[in-house]
Amino acid sequence: MKHITDLYESVNSTMSNKSDCPPVVLPEEVFFTISVIGVLENLIVLLAVIKNKNLQSPMYFFICSLAISDMLGSLYKILENILIIFRNMGYLEPRGGFESTADDVVDSLFILSLLGSICSLSAIAADRYITIFHALQYQRLVTPRRAAVVLLIIWACCIGSGITIVTFSHHVPAVIAFTALFPLMLVFILCLYGHMFLLARSHARRVSTLPRANMKGAITLTVLLGVFIFCWAPFVLHILLMTFCPADPYCACYLALFQVNAVLIMCNAIIDPFIYAFRSPELRDAFKKMIICKRYP
């Protein structure tokens, strides 16, 4: 919260001095409501996979990882609002030691949300690539145990990177490293897509004989990736502009949309579960069983 709040205060200062564009301010109730819905939706996804043995496969493990990332992004805003309420009620000393520590923890959740989403989408992309072009070896190459190990490595790296970024968040190299992860992830996934496209053209007949579920999973990834880019790209651009051209009047007008960009990030956590449910009959069935309290096989 400290780093994001400082950023927002700096934006407001820039608006008043360098631009005719007033900052767009949204009610805190909007943030809180979206965050609570995001946590509940992704918690349902996790419970559905945990309770349904038919969903306990590497693909759904990676989806659960993405759901956890979305939950962290929603929890970030909920905890931030709680801290603000406590501070306004006088229970926290402004800029005090406890608040500073709590701010770092909350900011770490935000960083973890982005890093976890990037890595989870990359893992899903790699999984779909293997599913389509190494279908016969898939069961041998991608086992639940190997998927679990990959996820442990991913989250260990995310936690380490998140702590480092929060610790050095006021240094330009740290900001560049943080924002660079976004395009690097896109390049990695687009390279996989490009390779898949070239192989699909040269092996059109073999690809057409693949199980429909394999191709459907690739389409699901495409939708998830598109939503992720739409929701996160404006904020990443915001960070870059705030770092390199905060005084420019054109940049300042874009920076006025800080809270709008923040809402887009939280909407990502709400949209993803609907994509899972819409694209996966197995998950839809699991959700229905959870709603009517029917036992799983």
Swiss-Prot record:
Cysteine disulfide links: 21-253, 245-251
Superkingdom of source: Eukaryota
Keyword Ubl conjugation (UniProt): yes
Record keywords, A-Z: Cell membrane, Disulfide bond, G-protein coupled receptor, Glycoprotein, Lipoprotein, Membrane, Palmitate, Receptor, Transducer, Transmembrane, Transmembrane helix, Ubl conjugation
PTM description: Ubiquitinated by MGRN1 that may be involved in post-endocytic trafficking and/or degradation of internalized receptor.
Glycosylation sites: 12, 17
Gene Ontology molecular function: corticotropin receptor activity; G protein-coupled receptor activity
Extracellular-facing ranges: 1-23, 80-104, 169-180, 245-256
Transmembrane segments: 24-49, 59-79, 105-126, 148-168, 181-199, 218-244, 257-278
Keyword tRNA processing among UniProt keywords: no
Lipidated residues (S-palmitoyl cysteine): 293
Protein family (similarity comment): Belongs to the G-protein coupled receptor 1 family.
Task of the protein: Hormone receptor primarily expressed in adrenal cortex that plays a key role in regulating adrenocortical function. Upon corticotropin (ACTH) binding, facilitates the release of adrenal glucocorticoids, including cortisol and corticosterone. In addition, MC2R is required for fetal and neonatal adrenal gland development. Mechanistically, activates adenylate cyclase (cAMP), the MAPK cascade as well as the cAMP-dependent protein kinase A pathway leading to steroidogenic factor 1/NR5A1-mediated transcriptional activation.
Stated name of the protein: Adrenocorticotropic hormone receptor
Organism whose genome encodes this protein: Sus scrofa (Pig)
Designated gene of the protein: MC2R
